[in-house]
Amino acid sequence: FGLFLFSLFAVLIFGQAFANASEVFNLSKINQGIVGINIPLKNNKTKIMIQKDGKTYYYDVKTEKDMLPLQMGSGIYLLALLENIEGSKYAVNSSKSVQVNLDNEKISFLQSIRPVYWRKESKAAKLAKELTENMDTDEKKACAIYDYIINNIEYDRNKLTNLNTDYIPNVDEIIASGKGICFDYAAVYAAMLRSIDIPAKLVMGYKEDIDAYHSWNEVF
């Protein structure tokens, strides 16, 4: 669903870099937990790797310009542009090591960045503001939004069986349709919380009690 763990790649080849890393990666907002990418789209599969302290995230390149999260706190990050050679083999086209000093350690969980996109004028943001008006604590606000989501969005099993692996939720469309999968629930919840300045992380992975790949939230 847009980000993958290292184990999904059979071979990752570090070879000669071809693209100029300074042109690929926009570092103007790294202290806000955001790295911009600027990549001409090609026919072959392309991914961005973001790595820190042994933990790695991979993102499919969907558009020529995008914003990706630096969500592992302050420190040294390795950023790399990967291009598919064949099958599950990827070569490093360009890479750059950067020092990130976040303005706030949770700041990336307030941003509109993949896979949680939102705007102040969006339905999700307006609804979050309406639901939490006159509430005096973040806990009350988080609970109010949670209750709304679980009572107004129905789990869509049909969608799950027909979903592409590069799917990214449109939170306003999910709210309007009243249907979604776990990824949708988590994206809507994170977007609504972020819009009212509550840091929220969207987590993806496996749980012991759930067979399929799953999504959930961490709220700070």
Can you say where each PLM-predicted feature lies in the sequence?
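N-terminal accessory/pre-domain segments preceding catalytic cores
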Residues: 2-139
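N-terminal start-of-chain detector that recognizes signal peptides
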Residues: 20-22, 50-53, 172-173, 187-192
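Short, solvent-exposed coil/turn segments
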Residues: 32, 168, 212-213
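Generic detector of short, locally flexible boundary/turn motifs and exposed helical patches
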Residues: 43-46, 165-168, 180-186, 194
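Residues in flexible loops and secondary-structure boundaries
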Residues: 58, 135, 163, 182-183, ...
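Secondary-structure boundary elements
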Residues: 110-177, 188-190
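Solvent-exposed loop/turn segments at secondary-structure junctions
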Residues: 152-155, 179-182, 207-210
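Hydrophobic/aromatic-rich core segments of domains that either
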Residues: 184-220
